[in-house]
Curated annotation (Swiss-Prot):
Its job: Chaperone involved in the maturation of iron-sulfur cluster-containing proteins. Has a low intrinsic ATPase activity which is markedly stimulated by HscB.
UniProtKB keywords: ATP-binding, Chaperone, Nucleotide-binding
Protein name per the record: Chaperone protein HscA homolog
Any single GO BP term: iron-sulfur cluster assembly
Gene3D superfamilies, alphabetized: 1.20.1270.10, 3.30.420.40, Actin, Chain A, domain 4, Substrate Binding Domain Of DNAk, Chain A, domain 1
Any Pfam family matching the protein: HSP70
Keyword Repeat: no
The species this protein was found in: Shewanella denitrificans (strain OS217 / ATCC BAA-1090 / DSM 15013)
Record's signal peptide: none
PROSITE patterns in the cross-refs: HSP70_1, HSP70_2
Family: Belongs to the heat shock protein 70 family.
GO terms for MF: ATP binding; ATP hydrolysis activity; ATP-dependent protein folding chaperone; unfolded protein binding
Keyword Endoplasmic reticulum carried by entry: no
Length: 619
């Protein structure tokens, strides 16, 4: 597997080979597939030049139709034609029971309690239906790119839970396709605009699709996108604009009742008029009915009056979501527009007015999510130019933590495949220590000063025990996106704290290569220095431990014995200031030999204290 081959930074194991990977926007209404070709991310068209594929599946007795062909049959065979399958992903039958009457389908239930659609070919679950939508997109990509895909990145709404995400992944794996990553749709849109590597701050992603509206508030910091809040309306989208215009035409022409065929004809014309009004002040609607031609001039003002209430609802959702995130509009540095319905001028005007800044619209809003997914897929599969964002499926440099003496304890070694989790236990250095500071570093050198600092945090409320008695478990976890979470937990109380950081942020291939070369160049000196430092730390521990023992139980010794130990302590302290490792080691051993009798006296004294007042029968 190419991603797991170890090569020097900036070099693939087979530099001449371009690996094929795509990004897929698996949408509620439409789906798209995109790829990076000649350095540019583009959506891929079908044989008829169409980029979007309607997310519709028709199940006939002997055949399954997907996309445009299925959509054409949706009015005639609604019970056999699945639309908006994404709404059912990861849901149990009980989850959708309240709204089942809204759907024309016959439902049954699986052994796991999941909804099944009863079709002429048999029962179909949402995962299988999603796989049927993905299939023509995968086939289109492999035909266009001329080879088998090595992986895909599929986008999902930011609010999808684990079950919905797993269902999406399972749909691709039913087709034998490797899912490199599931990517949040708003994050994909931000990546398409290059916001992941250029800025830090709060980004709002306004996504008005055909059937749903989503608003996501993201914080970008250190190359990491954090979803602060999401909101929206799952029953509001561009289709509602079409229906309002359809009803307006129907009323204007006096069509009090309309057949399914006429309703569809009116809806298609309403959609055409809506799209034409984006660039025109007036458009004439035309419909042929029983040999008669009906026409009506629609102005942009007419259309905006029809949809104004719906647009205001989306702005209200934006206001609520910002409030949930604890963010003001002044803190939003960019607004990204996603979804074909954001082309409507009134929508753009209202969004600009609310956020008080011009939204990003230069990338086709229908395609921006797929394009961002394609950029991510190209990086993950290994086609990364030196100038691109560093995102590897192995850890390029070791991750570790600072220990006493400024030494580095490596927790996750370089070239470990991700995702990964590793843990180590540490303990307190001094008696009564109730807090511990952690310094997370990255690099191959033995000393902290020679490594890259990533983060610092402190664990407090550690029980006040003797040095070495408290046990703190430190867990390093790197997820599939390269995001490092470090958690420190005191085992007896469960008190814990954590921090997140992206080790790859701001780190170029050249810097990685330099750090690796330095580690090899200085390896011998670093090891010697580490061994010396470890002896100095041990000397410090012995000195502090013995000094505390003398303070507590020094009266157990004769004066001459106490003076002898104090002299040995001073001697070790003086030798530890130097750089002779062997001399420090010998001084520690000499002091250890001198304290044997004192240790026995302390042990006897502790036993006597414990047994004082106890009868033989109780022992």
């Amino acid at each position: 597997m190419a991603l797991l081959q170890i090569a020097e930074p900036g070099q693939s194991a087979a530099p001449h080979e371009h690996r094929l990977a795509v990004g897929i926007d698996l949408g509620t209404t439409n789906s798209l597939v995109a790829a990076v070709r000649s350095g540019e991310a583009l959506t891929l068209a079908d044989s008829e030049g169409r980029h979007s594929l309607p997310s519709v599946v028709h199940y006939g007795v002997d055949s399954t139709l997907v996309g445009h062909d299925a959509e054409a049959l949706s009015a005639l065979f609604p019970a056999q034609t699945l639309v908006s399958v994404k709404r059912f992903m990861g849901k149990s039958l009980s989850d959708i029971q309240a709204g089942m009457q809204e759907f024309p389908y016959e439902f049954s239930v699986s052994e796991q309690g999941l909804p099944l659609f009863v079709m002429p070919q048999g029962a179909v679950n949402p995962i299988q239906a999603s796989a049927d939508i993905l299939r023509p997109l995968i086939e289109r990509a492999e035909k266009t790119l001329g080879g088998q895909l090595q992986g895909v990145v599929i986008t999902v709404p930011a609010y999808f839970d684990d079950a919905q995400r797993q269902g999406t992944k399972d749909a691709a794996e039913l087709l034998g396709v490797k899912v490199l990553r599931l990517l949040n749709e708003p994050t994909a849109a931000a990546i398409a605009y290059g916001l992941d590597s250029k800025q830090e701050g709060v980004i709002a992603v306004y996504d008005l699709g055909g059937g749903t509206f989503d608003i996501s508030v993201l914080r970008l910091s250190g190359g990491v996108f954090e979803v602060l809040a999401t909101g929206g309306n799952s029953a509001l989208g561009g289709d509602d604009f079409d229906h309002l215009l359809q009803q307006h035409l129907q009323a204007a022409w006096g069509l009090t009742s309309a057949s399914a065929q006429l309703s569809r004809q009116l809806l298609i014309e309403a959609r055409r008029v809506k799209e034409a009004l984006t660039d025109n002040d007036t458009v004439t609607a035309h419909v042929s009915l029983d040999g008669s031609d009906l026409s009506l001039e629609i102005s942009k003002a007419d259309f905006e009056a029809l949809i104004a209430t719906l647009v205001k609802k989306t702005i209200s959702s934006c206001r609520r979501t910002l409030r949930d995130a604890g963010i003001s509009t002044d803190e939003v540095i960019e607004t990204v527009m996603v979804g074909g319905s954001t082309r409507v001028p009134l929508v753009r005007q209202q969004v600009e007015q609310f956020f008080n800044k011009t939204p990003l619209t230069s990338i086709d809003p229908d395609r921006v999510v797929a394009i961002g997914a394609a950029i991510q897929a190209d990086i993950l599969v290994g086609n990364k130019p030196d100038s691109d964002l560093l995102l590897l499926d192995v850890i390029p440099l070791s991750l570790g933590i600072e220990t006493m003496g400024g030494l580095v304890e490596k927790v996750i070694p370089r070239n470990t495949t991700i995702p990964v989790a590793r843990a180590q236990e540490f303990t307190t250095f001094k008696d009564g220590q109730t807090a511990m500071a952690f310094h997370v570093v990255q690099g191959e050198r033995e000393l902290v000063d020679d490594c890259r600092s990533l983060a610092r945090f402190t664990l407090t409320d550690i029980p006040a025990l003797a040095a070495g008695a408290a046990h703190i478990r430190v867990t390093f976890q790197v997820d599939a996106d390269g995001l490092l979470s470090v958690t420190a937990m005191e085992k007896s109380t469960g008190v814990n704290t954590s921090i997140q950081v992206k080790p790859s942020f701001g780190l170029s291939d050249l810097e990685i290569a330099t750090m690796l070369k330095d580690s090899m160049k200085h390896a011998k000196d670093d090891i010697s220095l580490r061994m010396l430092t470890e002896q100095k730390v041990e000397a410090m521990r012995v000195i502090e431990s013995l000094q505390a023992a003398l303070n507590n139980d020094g009266d157990l010794l004769e004066l001459s014995e106490r003076e002898s130990l104090q002299a040995a302590l001073a001697n070790l302290g003086e030798i530890a200031k130097g750089n002779d490792r062997d001399a420090i080691e010998q001084a520690i051993k000499a002091l250890d030999d001198k304290t044997q009798d004192f240790a026995s006296l302390r042990m006897d004294n502790s036993i006597k204290a414990a047994l004082k007042g106890q009868s033989i029968d109780n022992i």
